[in-house]
Amino acid sequence: MKYQANTRRRALEYEKALIEFWKKNQTFEKSIEQRDIDNSYVFYDGPPFITGMPHHGTLLSSVTKDAVPRFWTMRGKRVERRWGWDCHGLPAENFVEKQLGITDRREIGTKWPLATYIEKAKASMVANSEAWESTIERIGRWVDFRGAYRTMDKNYMESVWWAFKTLYEKGLIFEGRKVLMYDTKFSTPVSKA
C-alpha cells in the first residue's frame, strides 16, 4: 500500500484503505499462523463490560493492550488475541435494571419474573457488540472477535469454578477481612479495577 506525500487525502480515507488492506490480505491472521505455537507469548486481556459504548477511557486502555502483543509479535512470538466480554457484575445489573425500569431490587422475582430478567440480561449483552467491533477495528487494534468469550457462557463459568476449586484444594484460598468500597443500592462490595 503506497501513500504519496503532500497530498490532500483525508485521514479517514487512509484509515479505510488500510483496514481494507489488512482484511483482504488477512494480515492479522497471518501474524499468528506464520509463527510456531511452541513460541507463544500469552497475553491476558481483561475484557470490557459489554453494557456500555466504547469511550475515551476504554479506548485508551485498548490501545495500550494492543501495543504489548504487537511488540512481541514483531519479536517473532505467536500472540493470539482472543476478545472477551465481561457480562457480570454491577454494570450488567445496572444496565438491565435501567432498561426494565426497575427501581427496587425486590421487583426482580415479583414484578419481573427471574427468567424474564435473565433473558433480558442475556439479550442486552450483545446489544453493543457491533459498535465495539467497529470501533476497535477503526483504532487499528488486532483481535479475534470470532472466537470471543463471554463471562456468562457456561464453559467460561465452569472453567472459573474449576480454577477456584483447584486453588482451594491446594490450600491457596483463605477467608479474611478487607475494607472495600460498597454499593448501597445493590448491597455489595464494588470491585477494584
Regions found by a protein language model. Give the residues of each.
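N-terminal, positively charged nucleic-acid-binding surface of large information/translation enzymes
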Residues: 1-193
